[in-house]
Amino acid sequence: MNCLLELAIARQLLDSRDFFFLQIGAFDGETRDPLYQAVRKYGLSGVLVEPQQPAFKRLRENYKDQPQLQFVNAAISDRNEERIMYTRRDGNCTAASFDKQHLLKHSIPEEDIIAQPTPCLTFQELLKRSGREHVDLLQIDAEGADFAILKMVDFEHFRPSIVRYEQLHMSRSERDEVARRLVQNGYQLHADRMDVTAIQRAA
């Protein structure tokens, strides 16, 4: 687990006994997952979102002993609708995307790629279904869709204590736009090549 993220979670737990997270792009909950250890160590409550059926089944199985978790089998988009998502034929794909080119860039042979009809929810609909007005941690790893999802979030009114997202597939202008919005809304950013962890500054 990312050391900075774990420290941020542990610190937030001191202030919030009702810690709650949203994880968009949870995959199977275990493979290179930044929250798996913390969920088990602290018994964190939250909603885990994963659009791929095979991965979603493994996700629920891997967390079957964690009754405080909710699971949503959907992708996050700008409308509540069904869209085509591209994934591997064998169902084991950490690079699933609405953009077929994203998989090809990951050296997945075209003959191994299938188009899968996928239910989609807006970010606001996801929040509504979670039943929460405040979220302590927003974790996003959406294989190139992180920027589009972050654009849906109104950080002036929805302010998680911690925001973590993947910046690897963003353009320079997209990285700068997200960083600017977060800084303007009181976050301190800690970035590496792949990810950004944004922590709300103390009032």
Where do the model's predicted regions map?
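Phosphate/nucleotide-binding beta-alpha loop and adjacent structural elements of enzyme active sites
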Residues: M1-A203
